[in-house]
């Protein structure tokens, strides 16, 4: 679809971090601006959706938020704080890409291989330090889900709601 719209699509590496590193090299070589996957502007934009979700939902005890590089969960943490809510936020990572879970336990960024094949939006091998600090300050805990659990959640979404969810989007349901 991206090529059909005229984009040049470059695929590189085995995980998100490898692709990101290559994109940064290409941007620098071409004099292009590369929007980082974790940036304050991006977190603010995502927080608009998180604010709308938390305002429109009935009072929630807990929200399960998938963690890729961290912008989504940081946005949810910011929205919760802005609204003064007590909602617990639980981060969800792939058991095959547990960098944020390992880093939270260690108290500092820990790099681990990201080998998930189903939830590629969770395929983070090295946490962003700013995201990790925000997560550590506000998350209830981080849980790990297997690709099999994600696949079951994807099937449940399709069977129960007639919607197709990609792996990272189904991770929150897989964690419940």
Give the label of every model feature segment.
Residues 1-176:
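PLP-dependent amino-acid enzyme catalytic core
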């Amino acid at each position: 679809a991206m090529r059909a719209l005229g984009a040049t699509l470059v695929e590189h590496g085995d995980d998100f971090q490898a692709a990101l590193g290559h994109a940064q090299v290409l941007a620098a070589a071409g004099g292009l601006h590369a929007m980082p996957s974790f940036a304050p502007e991006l977190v603010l934009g995502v927080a608009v959706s998180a604010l709308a979700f938390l305002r429109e939902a009935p009072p929630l005890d807990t929200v399960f938020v998938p963690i890729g590089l961290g912008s989504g969960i940081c946005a949810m943490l910011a929205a919760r704080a802005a609204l003064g809510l007590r909602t617990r936020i639980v981060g969800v990572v792939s058991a095959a890409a547990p960098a944020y879970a390992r880093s939270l336990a260690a108290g500092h960024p820990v790099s681990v291989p990201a080998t998930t094949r189903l939830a590629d939006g969770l395929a983070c091998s090295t946490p962003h330090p700013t995201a990790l600090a925000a997560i550590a300050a506000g998350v209830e805990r981080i849980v790990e889900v297997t690709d099999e659990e994600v696949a079951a959640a994807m099937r449940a979404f399709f069977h129960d709601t007639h919607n197709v969810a990609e792996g990272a989007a189904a991770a929150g349901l897989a964690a419940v």
